[in-house]
Amino acid sequence: MDSQRNLLLIALLFVSFMIWQAWQVDNNPQPTAQTTQQTTNTATGDKASQAVPGSGQGQLITVKTDVLSLTINTRGGDIEQANLLAYPDTLGSSNTFELLETTPSFVYQAQSGLTGKNGPDNPANGDRPLFEVPQTSFVLADGQDELRIPLTFTSKDGSVFIKTFVLKRNDYAIGVDYHVNNASAAPLELTLFGQLKQSINLPKKRDTGSNNFALQTYRGAAYSSDETKYKKYSFSDIEDKNLDITTKGGWVAMLQQYFATAWIPAANETNTFYSAELGNGLAAIGFKGAPVVIQPGEQKQLSATLWVGPEIQNKMAEIAPHLDLTVDYGWLWFISQPLFKLLKFIHSFVGNWGFSIIVITFIVRGIMYPLTKAQYTSMAKMRLLQPKLAAMRERIGDDKQRMSQEMMALYKAEKVNPLGGCLPLIIQMPIFLALYYMLMSSVELRHAPFILWIHDLSAQDPYYILPILMGITMYFIQKMSPTTVTDPMQQKIMTFMPVIFTVFFLWFPAGLVLYYIVSNLVTILQQQLIYRGLEKRGLHSREKKK
């Protein structure tokens, strides 16, 4: 099999992959859109004691650190809005990325509270405690490393519930502590819960999946338990069946491209993970701790951690085991993860993600050089066998079975592997697709600039210069490669392959196209080096292609 047929095969594989991606989107329709109610959603059925309703009317307080801007409703103490100050909404925008949101068209909130027999949160009748706050605005000052936001609620029996949010500098992990002082004459039985509530349907401004040629990243719920390191639990799963598992430690999360929210209960405690369809187009995933009894005059603290931010793998791994697995590298994660670690290591020296991609391309192609050399050697031997194969076809005629048997006998006698030219292709395709997943899922590469006009390696080239350059390099590889293709139709297909690939690559991330350009340039250099060696062995001639 010669190199041009390899190009045709890689094109077919890539087209098949893109068609499969588009089919995944088209055959997983979103549920029918419903009007979102911000304040009156209550779980029904068996989960009514777990999933909590909306926040209702309360006072909104603002919290700002160096990386987060939050809006907290004093009714329930839920986080109704969260902006990530280090991440612009779009490239070049002065607006920051809004992860949590509460609007008439879309709801995404982080909720927590105390349920149970004596808890101030009562999902059954829609009650949420109305907290008091010392001020309505909290800002992490210069030189300050920690910011605490206390919310206080006093029950009718005099018991005091203080809900404190603890935020730290340069940190997306938020501590949520409940300090309970039982001033009543009877024991208090309480259960700590935390849940993430989100609209199932995306409004247009949040919908980034309109381009069917783009990788469709996962959006939905996920969890980690003592039995499962990482498990996706989609909105469709929530609609079909409520999650209900008991585990020690672990976490529950809502995921989307580049960003995540997650509740992490205490690692040494047993919790119940649950999900619920709340109606009005809302779904939730959360945890509920074991009941805690506080005797009269006794004080206790219950705590959990909330992650609201980008999927920075090393930081997430420090917060909870396996939380870094929320970065959605798809079915090629086992290649994408080490590839990203290598890319990040290179970036620590180079300081530019584009140059890091160039370096990693040289490393990958260098490792694959022995296979590439074997590929070209195999193709050269196959070309030398063409006269014998042609004579064999003329002698045998239409007897396909006999032709196949004699061809295999000839390959064996000449020590030629007819599939030898395919191995580098088979290895390169997973690496290529893994890099695609990595570019589209690693937040470090979001809006990462290269040089000149390339301001975002995770987005397509705005001027299509890189795809055109890629097409030119493919053209030169094609011109320099000997061919045994004699069929006119195949020859026409091969002629248009650079054009076809250029069109495909117009919509691909600039970082991916950059990888392919550099890979093609390395191919040209390796090709010349290998051909010189083959000439000395009499396996290659530098005659011009006709």
From Swiss-Prot:
Membrane topology type: Multi-pass membrane protein
One Gene Ontology biological process: protein insertion into membrane
Function noted in UniProt: Required for the insertion and/or proper folding and/or complex formation of integral membrane proteins into the membrane. Involved in integration of membrane proteins that insert both dependently and independently of the Sec translocase complex, as well as at least some lipoproteins. Aids folding of multispanning membrane proteins.
Gene name of the record: yidC
Region Disordered, annotated ranges: 30-55
Protein name: Membrane protein insertase YidC
Transmembrane region(s): 6-26, 344-364, 419-439, 457-477, 498-518
Subunit structure: Interacts with the Sec translocase complex via SecD. Specifically interacts with transmembrane segments of nascent integral membrane proteins during membrane integration.
Organism in which the protein naturally occurs: Yersinia pestis
Keyword line: Cell inner membrane, Cell membrane, Chaperone, Membrane, Protein transport, Transmembrane, Transmembrane helix, Transport
